[in-house]
C-alpha cells in the first residue's frame, strides 16, 4: 500500500503566558520555564485507503493533531510527510463569519484552487447537501453550530480531497444528516481516500475506522486495530468515570504538569521559527484575502 501520512517524533510546543504583557515580552525574551507540550514525540504511518480514528479525553491533544494533519500549524520538532492534499472539516473551520454561506462556498473553493466555472458546476450540489435552506444567503455568524458544520462538511466533500480530516464535525448534526455524511465517508473509503476521524463517540469510531490512535496527555498511548484500542480505551474511561471530582481534578492537574517542561535552546529556536512563519502569513493573508474578494466582486458583476 502507498504511504499517505508519516509522523516522525512530532511535537508541538507552545509558550504559556499569564497576561498579555508577558506575551509581548515573549516576542523578544522567550521564557524557558513556560513550555507546554500540546503533542509530544508522536510517530505513526498511515496508508492509502485507511480510515484512522482519534480518541482521548478533553485536552488530550486530538485537535492539535487535526491541525497538524491539516497543515494549519507547523510542528515544533519532528517531521511530517504527507502525500496528498488535506482538507479539515471541523465546526466553523475555514468559514468567514462576516460572509454569507454562498460567499463562503466560493471563497473556500477558490482557496483550494478551483476555478469559478468548477465552483458554479458544483454550487447547487453543495447547497443541497448542506440542507440549510435560505440561510445560505445569510451571514455565517447567524448560523447555529450544526449549520456551520453542515456547510463546512458539504464544501469539503465536494472539493474531493486526497486526505480528509473530520474533527467532531458529525457531533452536532441530526441523525439524517449524520447518516448522509457516513454514506459519503464510505464512498471516499471505497475510492481509496485516506480519512482521519476525531470523535468522542465510540460508536462512530467503531463503525467508521480501520485503526485507532489513542492520544493521552499529548502522547500516542496506543495505535492499533479499532477493536483492540477501543477495548482498552473503554476500560480507561470506565476507570476515569468512577473517580471522584477531587480525584479527577488531581489526575488532570498531574497530567497538565507533566506536559510543562523547561524549553531547551533547540525548542526555543523552533518556536522562533514558528513566529517568523506567522509574521509572514500575517503579511500574506490580507493580500490574498483582498485578491479573492476582488475576484468575488468581479464574478458578481456578471451574475
Curated annotation (Swiss-Prot):
Domain of life from the UniProt record: Bacteria
Keyword Cell membrane on entry: yes
Record's keyword terms, sorted: ATP-binding, Cell membrane, Membrane, Nucleotide-binding, Translocase, Transport
UniProt cross-references to SMART domains, sorted A to Z: AAA
Cellular component aspect of the GO annotation: plasma membrane
Domain ABC transporter: 5-242
EC number: 7.5.2.4
Reaction(s) catalysed by this chain's protein: ATP + H2O + teichoic acidSide 1 = ADP + phosphate + teichoic acidSide 2
Disulfide bonds: none
Location within or outside the cell: Cell membrane
A GO molecular-function annotation: ATP hydrolysis activity
InterPro entries: AAA+_ATPase, ABC_transporter-like_ATP-bd, ABC_transporter-like_CS, ABC_transpr_TagH-like, Bact_Polysacc_Export_ATP-bd, P-loop_NTPase
Membrane topology: Peripheral membrane protein
Positions contributing to ATP binding: 56-63
Self-association state and partner proteins as the record states: The complex is composed of two ATP-binding proteins (TagH) and two transmembrane proteins (TagG).
The protein's role, per its UniProt record: Part of the ABC transporter complex TagGH involved in teichoic acids export. Responsible for energy coupling to the transport system.
Family label: Belongs to the ABC transporter superfamily. Teichoic acids exporter (TC 3.A.1.104.1) family.
Protein's UniProt name: Teichoic acids export ATP-binding protein TagH
